[in-house]
Structures are given as C-alpha cells and as structure tokens.
Amino acid sequence: MERLKGKKQIEKLFVSGRSVGVFPLRLVFLKTEETNKVGVSVSKKNFKSAVNRNKIKRLLRIAVENHFLDLFNKLKPKYYMMVLYVGKEIPKAEELDTQFKLMVSRFNKKVLDEV
C-alpha cells in the first residue's frame, strides 16, 4: 500500500472522486489504472495544534493498515483514497476503529453496486 502524494493526484481525487462518510470519518475514492494509494488528512481549522493533528493521523494510518490491507489485495480495480477526519475532538482508538469498520463496509457496498 502506497501513500497518496502529489498535488495533481490529490486534486484529481477531490474533483472527480466519490465519497462515503461515517461521522467523524469521510472516505473519498477514485478508480485509477495505477496502484492503490491512500492518504490521511486532518483539518488545521479544527485542530490548531500540530501535535494533535499528527496523533489523529497516526491513529488513522493504523486503522487503514488494519482494515484496508485485506481489501486492497481483493480489489481488482485500483483506487486512490483519502481518509479525512472531520470531527472536532481527539478520538479514542477503539471508537475510531469501530467507525472505520462501518466506513469500509459502506465503501464495499458502494463499490459492489458500481460493478
């Protein structure tokens, strides 16, 4: 699993991508010909302190590794994905994990409906 980097790729994702949301998370995804790439983002507007933003990003990356790794191996079309944290409080790891599972199941439904 690679990190989503580069202004053009991220811009393309937000302009043409689709999204799935489960508060406090939102997943924006776009089918692509390249490899699966994932990025995480936390709003500077909601979390002024870089320490808090980085803590949440760390939790998000762990959740991505735990829940998307199996899914990526099964997915035939490749995707660019961005996981956004839109909440206003620092989450507990267990709560984030539960919400992430729900978001992954909604993503699966949306992708399967597409095919």
Feature locations, PLM:
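Positively charged, solvent-exposed patches that mediate nucleic-acid binding
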Residues: 1-115
